[in-house]
Curated annotation (Swiss-Prot):
It comes from Oryza sativa subsp. japonica (Rice). Residues 290-496 form the MCM domain. It catalyses: ATP + H2O = ADP + phosphate + H(+). InterPro entries: AAA+_ATPase, MCM, Mcm3, MCM_CS, MCM_dom, MCM_lid, MCM_N, MCM_OB. ATP binds at residues 340-347. It is found in: Nucleus. This is DNA replication licensing factor MCM3. The gene is MCM3. Its main location: nucleus. A motif (Arginine finger) lies at residues 472-475. GO terms for cellular component: chromatin; MCM complex; nucleus; THO complex. Residues 653-670 have a biased composition (Basic and acidic residues). It is an enzyme of class 3 (hydrolase). Its EC number is 3.6.4.12. Pfam families: MCM (PF00493), MCM_lid (PF17855), MCM_N (PF14551), MCM_OB (PF17207), WH_MCM3_C (PF23191).
Length: 770
């Protein structure tokens, strides 16, 4: 629509009145001064200020922006020239952008309908493609050698708001037929770039393809964002005629002509915290069973796998990312992998992460390629120019990437994610494009063994079939086995039967992951935090008794807790925790040879040291502490030991604590009189007292020592598929891994107890497994 000069002048006066009325506040006049001082050429006008000045003007700007963009630019240009006449060259103008609330004109790419064509909208989404920045001619100057004169011509395309579009053909002769020579140095150009914006993955409709909108940015807005950025773009939604080669077509291509691009926070969809929420979070963080509580609250429909659930909680919390002054980047995100038999709920755990994590993208090994996970260089179908398209890991920046069926991925595609998992960047050097994109995300993968089911006669590395270069990039690697235990099978069957029998009061089915929401409005504060106990859903927890009614958090509160701890708590390492981490890492390295031969899942490398730091920091976040303490390191070692050895090494913790206590006591006694050095631990430091102490305590072995003995023996028998073993070999094996050594009489005493329980049979110094 071509607006006449009178209307243009009236619109310009309206914007001049708006800027003049601002003199008392000085907001926009100061903004114009800053713009002139910083040599910028765009002024951002807030819609709130425009509404306060004139509600009718704000509505007209949104409904018919083509009529008001040029007058607004002319008004700001006039004010800028009055402040500094030398600021703008002849023919230059100050551009105008808009920001602020747009009401129902604040939409996503899926909500852009034909009713928005010709109006100003604010579209939020994630940038998936960026074209190269190209110059667009605005004014051409031509020299005529015959007459010595010059001829200039201006160009406007369909995206311009001033006048009608002009042709794009350069004049080669003047009106008299004389040849013209183009003076390229005197021509005027402006930068031009096209973007593709997609709706954010977490808000896209399930089962539908994400919608995309093309965006045109010009002048100072080019290169203001890159693929993977979450942006909010304000612009005019226009319909461009299709390239039909002369035929009449009713199909139009829609684009968004941007006038303001602003980067959004990664946590734009962050939950809202109330004062009561913060109070309850602090109360939960002070509980002794916070780790178990969060682990049980994650995917309550999955029976068991408590240690894996705890590890998933730490993965969603993450460590602390560090960027040193020398350019070194220290990864803070935790990567995790699950390998095991089919039907052990690996994929269900990935779905639980998708439901809880603020930003999570799911993909599969067979349904994704290397460039689909990282980034790709594509060609634009219309212009033929190269574009950089972001992959799943770039789109999941500051989030979690869930990769199912990881073993089905090709080796070449799997190598593509090596850089992402450690350096957390995607570097592209193809087709004349060299770029580095951020991919700061955690990776949680699930895979089946190379033989379909886990072969216990082979080492974990041979079962997994993945190279060490990739395995070492995973902080945690869990072997999930389908155990043939009648008691466990009975408990699982009861749990699954309760899941299928569970229904609401009206007889309808109910989502298991959203229990507790219906009780949030009944006035009870606990109802909004803990899932209301249901015998059919939760069963009876014999270990916890009465506490079983409030041992699971609602999904809504769990999301709030994880988001709060992940983003607002940044713990730092203390000296005590650093020393404990160094000591623990040295012990893991010393036991590396035994781990490889005895069933260790991961190679113990320098990355394992960083894994301990990340897990400890994540545990400190979970406890809402700003310092990483020794208890956090011990909790991290529990998770790491379970991942490496597939058992709870409580005796390792006891050994570490006792060694630290013995070292501190020895240092203390070195400076004092050594008469009463170890009265309370006479059996540990003086070798002359070992036999005497053991002689009096052979028949009184503590229960925890008996359990540790049985655990070590059972693990050794299972790992080596033994049906009989000598007592001498048992004594050597147990003492090699135990926190404190067992003498011969204690070994025989524990074995006799196991024989009385019909678990083993002893004959002629040989123990036969029943």
């Amino acid at each position: 629509m071509d607006v006449n000069e009178e209307a243009m002048a009236a619109h310009k006066r309206a914007f001049l009145d708006f800027l003049d009325q601002d003199v008392g506040k000085g907001v926009y006049m100061q903004a114009v001064r800053d713009m002139v001082q910083n040599k910028r050429h765009r002024l951002i006008i807030g819609m709130d200020d425009l509404r306060n000045h004139s509600l009718d003007l704000a509505r007209r700007v949104i409904r018919s922006p083509a009529e008001y963009m040029q007058p607004a630019s002319d008004a700001v240009t006039e004010v800028a020239r009055n402040l500094d006449p030398k600021f703008l060259k002849e023919g230059q103008r100050v551009l105008v952008g808009f920001s602020g609330p747009f009401g129902f004109h604040r939409v996503t790419p899926r909500d852009l309908m034909s009713s928005f064509i010709g109006t100003m909208v604010c579209v939020e989404g994630i940038v998936t493609k960026c074209s190269l920045v190209r110059p667009k001619v605005v004014k051409s100057v031509h020299y005529c050698p015959a007459t010595g004169g010059t001829l200039s011509r201006e160009y406007r395309d369909i995206t311009s708001f001033v006048g009608l579009p002009t042709g794009s053909v350069y004049p080669t002769r003047d009106e008299n037929g004389n040849l013209l020579v183009t003076e390229y140095g005197m021509c005027e150009y402006k930068d031009h770039q096209t973007l593709s914006m997609q709706e954010v993955p977490e808000n896209s409709a399930p089962g539908q393809l994400p919608r995309t909108v093309d965006i045109i940015v010009e002048d100072d807005l080019v290169d203001s964002c890159k693929p993977g950025d979450r942006v909010s773009i304000v612009g005019v939604y226009k319909a461009l005629p299709g390239k039909s080669k002369g035929s009449v077509s009713g199909v139009f291509r829609t684009v968004l002509i941007a006038n303001n691009v602003s980067l959004m926070n990664k946590e734009a969809n962050a939950p809202v915290y109330t004062r009561e929420d913060l109070k309850r979070m602090k109360e939960i963080s002070r509980r002794n069973d916070t780790f178990d509580l969060l682990g049980n609250s994650l995917a309550p429909s999955i029976y068991g796998h408590l240690w894996i659930k705890k590890a998933v909680v730490l993965l969603m919390l993450g460590g602390v990312e560090k960027n040193l002054k020398n350019g070194t980047h220290l990864r803070g995100d935790i990567n995790m992998m699950m390998v095991g038999d089919p039907s052990v709920a690996k994929s269900q755990l990935l779905r639980a992460v998708m439901n809880i994590a603020p930003l999570a993208i799911s993909t599969t090994g067979r349904g994704s390629s290397g460039v689909g996970l990282t980034a790709a260089v594509t060609s634009d179908q219309e212009t033929g120019e190269r574009r950089l398209e972001a992959g799943a890991m770039v789109l999941a920046d500051r989030g979690v990437v869930c990769i199912d069926e990881f073993d089905k991925m090709n080796d070449q595609d799997r190598v593509a994610i090596h850089e992402v998992m450690e350096q957390q960047t995607v570097t592209i050097a193809k087709a004349g494009i060299h770029a580095s994109l951020n991919a700061r995300c955690s990776v949680i993968a699930a895979a089946n063994p190379i033989y379909g089911t886990y072969d216990r006669s082979l080492t974990p590395t041979k079962n997994i079939g993945l190279p060490d270069s990739l395995l070492s990039r995973f902080d945690l690697l869990f072997i999930v086995l389908d155990q043939m235990d009648p008691e466990i099978d009975r408990q699982i069957s009861e749990h699954v039967a309760r899941m299928h029998r569970y229904c609401t009061d009206d007889g309808g089915a109910r989502s298991l992951d959203k229990t507790g929401y219906a009780e949030e409005d009944d006035g009870d504060v606990n109802a909004a935090i803990f899932v209301k106990y249901d015998r059919m859903l939760h069963g009876q927890d014999r270990r916890r008794g009465k506490k079983s009614k409030q041992d699971r958090l609602t999904v809504k509160f769990l999301k709030k807790y994880i988001h709060y701890a992940k983003n607002l708590i940044q713990p730092r390492l203390t000296d005590e925790a650093s020393d404990h981490i160094a000591t623990s890492y040295a012990e893991l390295r010393d036991g590396g040879a035994n781990a490889k031969s005895g069933g260790g899942t991961l190679p113990i490398t320098a990355r394992t040291l960083e894994t301990i730091i990340r897990l400890s920091t994540a545990h400190a976040k979970m406890k809402l502490r700003h310092e990483v303490l020794k208890t956090d390191v011990e909790a991290a070692l529990q998770v790491l030991n379970f991942a490496i050895y597939h058992k709870e090494l409580t005796e390792m913790e006891e050994r570490e604590q006792r060694e630290m206590e013995m070292k501190q006591q020895a240092d203390h006694d070195a400076g004092a009189s050594g008469g009463n050095a170890d009265e309370h631990r006479s059996s540990g430091n003086d070798p002359m007292d070992v036999d005497v102490g053991n002689a009096s305590n052979d028949q009184d072995v503590p229960a925890e020592r008996i359990e540790a003995f049985e655990a070590i023996l059972g693990q050794h028998v299972l790992a080596n598929h033994l049906d009989q073993i000598s007592i001498d070999e048992i004594e050597q094996t147990v003492n090699r891994e135990a926190a404190a050594p067992y003498n011969r009489r204690q070994v025989e005493f524990i074995l006799e107890r196991m024989q009385d329980a019909n678990r083993i049979m002893i004959r002629d110094g040989i123990v036969r497994i029943i």
